[in-house]
Amino acid sequence: MQMGDHQMMGNQRYYRTYVQKVMPAQAGGAVSQNATYVQTAGIRTVHHDGNGQQRIVQLPPGVRQIQQNGVGPAYVRQVPGGQPMQVNFGHPGTIAGRNVAVGVQMRPVQGHNVQQGYQRQQVANQIQQQNRAVFMAQNQQGQQQISYAQAQHRQQQQNQQQHHQQPQHFNHPSQQNQMIMQHRQPQMHHNQQHQMVQPQMTRHQMAQHHAQQPHPQIYVPRDMNLAVPLREPSPEPIPVKIEVPDVPPEGTSAANEEPMPDDGDIDIQIRNVVCNYTLPLHIDLRKLAMNTHNVTYEREKGVMMKQKRSPGCYIKVYSSGKVYIVGCRSEADCKRAARSIARHVQRVMGKTKERVSIRNYRVNNVLATCRLPFGIKIEEVAAKYPSESTYEPELSVGLVWRSVTPKATLRIHTTGSITVTGAQSEADVLEVLSKIYPIVLEFRCLERAKGNVAAQKKRKRKAPVNRGPPIKRERFDDSNYRNSGVINNQVYFSDEDEDLYDELDLEE
């Protein structure tokens, strides 16, 4: 902390502008309880003339002769309270731990020093900077040794003569600075007095005091640019032209797209054929079931069910003579199964000598599937043909197409798979697929085409779980009654003895 104090000597006031930290005396010591300061720099002298004006002169730095254990702001305490003061006059020494000059005695401003009080601050600054250099230069030239005070007095006289000879130009920057300092001097004097009067503040009070002081504003000229780039500007990127292929909108059809390669004829597979007919006789189902193998007879429903291996199908026979055949893979297999079961009924019922004919033979349903070599945009098909098609993605993944002539129902999937149901014959299946092919070809899509990749993949059977050898369990017979079990509604265990409860009196 730097502070300043002053001492009045006659009509002159001494200022110590640069002081060190305040060192309060300790209680119980030889030094009285007062705040003292240590001088470390120059002294400024203020002189009052007859007109009431103040003149300031800056004296060179030096060491003032002080008294030991003095009291008041004019004296300096260099050691803690209770210890003797160090004499620093006339020999090398320190003031508050700093090296000081020796052999110089500061006197009150008298005689010619009073005249120096009327000099401008520019002369005082020159004296402060040059006095010691002149004194050392004269001694080095081998001239007569003079004291430091005499050299200082001679230098002041030379500067005074140069000052009277040179004209005063207040436009000079150095003189403008002097005028600014003279205007600021009363404010500095007020701040110094305020610091002398106030006692030592606590750390919290000092923080508040500094926070209240306004921060100095820095004036930046207009020509000065503080936005200094941290690095050199990078060159501007060169635009690169990227060619984007023309993509047709989603709403357009795929008729203008590149046609997909022809993989050959479309393979249509018949999965199921359902037919029925009637025999002109009453059939005894119990007798027929007793003379037929691989059958199931349900007397309550009045039906006999038979599973035929060649051709593979499933047959239902009613006592009224109606026969239903399900599961054949072609119409030819369905006719062959119908003739076979009719001949077997004729033999069992003893009608071999009579003519039994098949009446009302009809194919009810043909189920067929086929796979197209491209994908289909079924949402666009449903939008273009709302009367023939029905598409409900929340209910089913496929589009339902209802054909009137020939009568059939088709289920079309996005993968290109088509399922035909409700056809009356294989010819109807071929006809309805021939009609639907140009429609789905218009809405094909390449990204959904899978080709024969899915067809080439074989379904892998799940590997059986490796289990240990089967555990053979004993049969419940008379030989293992004693192990455990239930006999005559009584539960017993093999480790129980027959006379276990004989010794207990249960009536008590």
UniProtKB/Swiss-Prot annotation:
One Gene Ontology CC term in the entry: nucleus
Pfam families referenced in this protein's UniProt entry, alphabetically: TBP
KW Iron (keyword) present: no
Source organism superkingdom: Eukaryota
InterPro entries given in the database record: TBP, TBP-like, TBP_dom_sf
Keyword ATP-binding recorded: no
Main location: nucleus
Gene3D superfamilies: TATA-Binding Protein
Disruption phenotype: RNAi-mediated knockdown causes early embryonic defects, including premature cell division of the Ea and Ep blastomeres, a failure to undergo gastrulation, and embryonic arrest. Knockdown causes severe loss of polymerase II large subunit ama-1 phosphorylation. Knockdown also causes a reduction in expression levels of several embryonic genes.
GO molecular function, one term: general transcription initiation factor activity
Region described as Disordered: spans on this chain: 145-190, 236-262, 456-479
One GO biological process term: positive regulation of transcription by RNA polymerase II
Keywords, in A-Z order: DNA-binding, Nucleus, Transcription, Transcription regulation
CDD domains hit by this protein: TLF
Family, as annotated: Belongs to the TBP family.
Function in brief: May be a general transcription factor. Plays an essential role for RNA polymerase II/ama-1 transcription in early embryos whereby it activates a subset of RNA polymerase II promoters and facilitates the reestablishment of transcription after mitosis.
Protein name: TATA box-binding protein-like 1
